[in-house]
Amino acid sequence: KDKKVPVPIKVKDKPVPIIDINDDALLDQDITLAIKAFEDFGKAILIIWNKLDLLPKNSDPLKIIKEKTAKYKHFFDIVPQILFSARTKRNKEKLIPEIKALWARYSQRIDSKEVYLYIKELLSQKSLFKIQQKLQIQSLHVIKTSPPTFVIRSRQYALFGSSEVNFLTNHLRKQFDFKGVPIIWKINND
């Protein structure tokens, strides 16, 4: 008999992780791979929680997922998730529409001027300061989709740290429906 040899999965090739809701041993590994694909390789992510049929009868799958993924809350708040059972086909009808919706969000075209005006308005309401300097943006351009990539030109480009970028990312994600989509920023001098 031929033995099946596991084929290593390249992180960048796994944009739709299927995670066994009952397998705690692989849970951290699967989530780590999903986060790496999202953050390091710019892959859109949809999490599919499989094997719902194996949960105890009166259990709450959402509560179980929330407990098991508490330390990854920041990630699970921004990616779509589907509860699924391959055996019973529960929620099978939701898979293709959700994958298509994710692809539409990932590849959507956004006008640079629209994004710039949105960010400018946002910063007029909530200014960003670093080392007692008000951070200002001279220009913003969308340079690509899949994943959406933005270039900001600012005289204080060196002061833009992770908290400032996260602030912009979180607001942009909500405004333009980038759920499950990584957002790439390039910040340069004026």
What feature does the model see in each segment?
Residues 1-14, 22-24, 28, 32-190:
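C-terminal-of-GTPase-core extension/linker across diverse P-loop GTPases
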